[in-house]
């Protein structure tokens, strides 16, 4: 990846940005971007000339999580908040706002169905079970190496 990004730096004028890419893609100011499926869902909702592609070579799979620290002062309140967030109505509202696939299958089916907010939006329900997709687990040594290479790419 380092060599590919270095070569890209020499042949193109890439922009290494974060959330700014969402508006850039929505407004068709950029030709390609790496983004989370929820962000892509929102881009496609605003601009159907864009498309969502998961590479045949595989991609990383991510899962957002809600956790309660062991030393929490209010674990009961934290659990109530999580219960609220995963309630059907709030999952639906949250998914409509952020574009991320809800954990409740019935909410997903409603939003992705013919009368749903994200009908025929390929980014809303990303593929699952693809044999080349991975969930990455970084160790400190690998994280340091990746950070070093990324910094070299950005300063080229």
Describe the function of each predicted region.
Residues 126-156:
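Conserved C-terminal helix/tail region of periplasmic/extracytoplasmic solute-binding proteins
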Residues 69-130:
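Mature extracytoplasmic/periplasmic domains
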Residues 8-12, 29, 37, 44, ...:
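Sec/Tat-exported extracytoplasmic proteins
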Residues 1-55:
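Ligand-binding pocket segment of bilobal, Venus flytrap-like solute-binding proteins
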Residues 64-66:
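Short amphipathic alpha-helical segments
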Residues 48-60, 69-72:
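Short beta-strand->loop
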Residues 2-6, 22, 26, 34, ...:
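Non-transmembrane alpha-helical segments in soluble domains
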Residues 16-19, 27, 72-76, 88, ...:
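Soluble non-cytosolic domains of exported or imported proteins
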């Amino acid at each position: 990846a380092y060599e590919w990004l270095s070569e890209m730096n020499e042949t193109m004028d890439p922009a290494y940005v974060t959330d700014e890419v969402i508006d850039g893609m929505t407004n068709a100011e950029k030709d390609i971007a790496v983004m989370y499926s929820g962000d892509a869902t929102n881009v496609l909702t605003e601009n159907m000339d864009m498309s969502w592609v998961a590479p045949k070579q595989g991609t990383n799979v991510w899962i957002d999580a809600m956790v309660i620290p062991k030393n929490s002062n209010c674990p009961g309140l934290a659990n109530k908040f999580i219960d609220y967030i995963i309630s059907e109505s709030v999952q639906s509202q949250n998914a409509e706002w952020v574009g991320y696939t809800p954990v409740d299958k019935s909410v997903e089916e409603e939003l992705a169905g013919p009368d749903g907010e994200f009908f025929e939006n390929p980014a809303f329900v990303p593929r699952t079970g693809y044999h080349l997709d991975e969930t990455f687990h970084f160790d400190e040594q690998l994280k340091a190496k990746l950070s070093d290479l990324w910094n070299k790419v950005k300063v080229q």
